Swiss-Prot record:
PROSITE patterns referenced in this protein's UniProt entry, alphabetically: COPROGEN_OXIDASE (PS01021)
The name this protein goes by in its record: Oxygen-dependent coproporphyrinogen-III oxidase
Provenance organism: Methylococcus capsulatus (strain ATCC 33009 / NCIMB 11132 / Bath)
Annotated positions for site Important for dimerization: H177
Lineage: Bacteria, Pseudomonadati, Pseudomonadota, Gammaproteobacteria, Methylococcales
Subunit relationships: Homodimer.
Length: 304
């Protein structure tokens, strides 16, 4: 069984960041990604790219990082006590895209690799990641396309993989205090090492490479739909849920902040504008109610 090759993972992730940024810019008439290179105090660093003020994307961030540390923070060892006291390397690409048009969903993707080492002991490593979609005014055909693409990413690795990681995504991206999912899900996996390094790495690449196939057709179909103040206000209200999840539940955010990560890069996932309204409820029979009734509970979107 091949050992972990973090340099190969890092090379793939840098290429993935580049290809995703280039593809997203093709949907944007004027705004471009601005790059910010940074260093991590304990070792390593990253390459953050942010696009803001666009006609298609109000804000989007695509972050690459490769950081080192002398010990893993509590968020990483809570369910893996054998990792306590180990030095670590973590590398990944994480992105969140917040479109301007409320008919275009917000999307999130993340692919990452952890390596935890201790002198004289066998390295412990794992992959994690996935992608998920958060619509405001959903179209069923878009959600089916998203999940079909997610299933295609998984099929070469077994027919049980998509149902397993789809269910994990539904469970992970759930706001307990709201009793609703963050969106319509997709894929989520973590602690993946049971297939060995090469097969696990191949799966990571498949997930990373299918993100654009899942998202760009939806952007292209919906970005020119006319909208008004009502739709914009609802988008901003629902973005508040995104903020709540990221600051209360998200393990990646907690890990980054607890490990002394770069705050600007960690919090770039937050939308540029979000609203909260006290005890707001959608009108009965409205498009806004449709989201609540049909899209914010776990659901099987594909025929078996």
């Amino acid at each position: 069984m091949a050992g972990p090759d973090i340099e190969a993972v890092k090379s793939y992730l840098l290429d993935l960041q580049e290809s995703i940024c280039n593809a997203l810019e093709t949907e944007e008439p004027r705004a471009r990604f601005v790059e910010d290179r940074w260093e991590h105090a304990a070792g390593g660093g990253g390459r953050t790219r942010v696009l803001s003020g666009g006609e298609t994307f109000e804000q989007g961030g695509v972050n690459f990082s490769h950081v080192r540390g002398a010990s893993l923070p509590a968020s990483a060892t809570a369910h893996r006590p054998e990792l306590a006291g180990r030095g670590f390397q973590a590398t990944g690409v994480s992105l969140v895209i917040h479109p301007l048009n409320p008919y275009v969903p917000t999307s999130h993707a993340n692919v990452r690799f952890f390596l935890a080492e201790k002198e004289g002991e066998t390295p412990i490593w794992w992959f994690g990641g996935g992608f998920d979609l958060t619509p405001f005014y959903p179209f069923e055909e878009d959600v089916i396309h998203w999940h079909r693409t997610a299933r295609n990413a998984c099929l070469p690795f077994g027919e049980d993989v998509y149902p397993r990681f789809k269910r994990w995504c539904d469970e992970y991206f759930f706001l307990n205090h709201r009793n609703e999912t963050r969106g319509v899900g997709g894929l989520f996996f973590d602690d993946l090492n049971e297939w060995g390094f090469e097969r696990s790495f191949a799966f990571l690449r498949s997930v990373g490479d299918h993100y654009l196939k899942a998202y760009l057709p939806i952007v292209q179909r919906r970005k020119a739909i006319p909208y008004g103040e009502r739709e914009r206000e609802f988008q901003l209200y629902r973005r508040g849920r995104y903020v709540e999840f990221n600051l209360v539940y998200d393990r990646g955010t907690l890990f980054g902040l607890q490990s002394g990560g770069r705050t600007e890069s960690i919090l770039m996932s937050l939308p540029p504008v979000a609203h909260w309204r006290y005890d707001w409820r959608p009108e009965r029979g409205s498009a806004e109610e449709n989201l609540y009734l049909n899209y914010l509970k776990p659901k099987e979107w594909l025929e078996s």
